[in-house]
A protein has these predicted regions:
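Domain-level signal for soluble alpha/beta catalytic cores
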Residues: 1-220
Length: 220
């Protein structure tokens, strides 16, 4: 699991005024920055493959923020509309995945924050669905759906039938277990929008994505 190319690009142009200034000093042309991020990531992925990696997951927080109406503009470059940013991030990711080995599996996880049993972003996948779910080179999408802040399943209709949707219905933020029948019902509901034959179940995220971890004991 590695940060997605679009995630790195976003960090370089959004994280802080100091970092933005340092980035602009080297890359006054953002298009060149995007191009080089994709190029370096492709080289990294091929090197990981050379050393034995056959399944690489791109951890991407950008989409979760861009669907959050309360602060998506924090990722704005000052002159682009949300749709233009979504298209840009899609292209950055796709350009890193060109002409990869056929036996290398690329997946992506849309992370919405997972630390101290809390989260960072909310909002349905709808605004990003026509972009992220159409990314070329990605075989599976790990999606958080453990509570209402992720919206409904309707955006899954944008995922091609041959791509795998991994439903993150099991929370990793608290110890209480989900009701099996409730999980079955939600999976059936998701099946209205994406074939169950290419649908899987998982936790919504990891159990300790940062050093703070979540409010869980080892036993839990």
């Amino acid at each position: 699991s590695i940060p997605a190319p679009a995630q790195l690009y976003c960090e370089l142009i959004c994280r802080s005024d100091k970092l933005i200034a340092a980035t602009d000093a080297v890359y006054p042309d953002r298009a060149e920055l995007a191009k080089d991020v994709s190029k370096v990531y492709r080289e990294l992925i091929l090197d990981l493959y050379k050393h034995g990696a056959r399944d690489i997951k791109l951890d991407d927080c950008t989409w979760g923020v861009l669907v959050n109406d309360s602060f998506w503009h924090a990722f704005d470059e000052g002159h682009l509309k949300r749709e233009e940013i979504l298209q840009l991030y899609k292209e950055i990711n796709e350009n890193a995945l060109v002409d990869l080995p056929e036996d290398l599996r690329i997946t992506t996880h849309i992370c919405r924050g997972n630390y101290d049993s809390t989260w960072a972003s909310e909002g349905g996948y709808g605004p990003a669905a026509p972009y992220v779910f159409k990314e070329k080179g990605v075989e599976a999408f790990y999606l958080e759906f453990d509570d209402d802040r992720s919206g409904d399943f309707a955006p899954l209709a944008e995922v091609p039938a041959d791509k795998v949707v991994v439903l993150g219905l099991v929370t990793s933020k608290k110890p209480e277990l989900e009701d099996p029948e409730a999980l079955k019902a939600r999976i059936k509901e998701a099946g209205q929008y994406h074939p169950l034959a290419t649908t899987a179940l998982s936790t919504q995220c990891g159990f300790a994505s940062t050093e703070e971890g979540n409010h869980l004991t080892d036993e839990e």
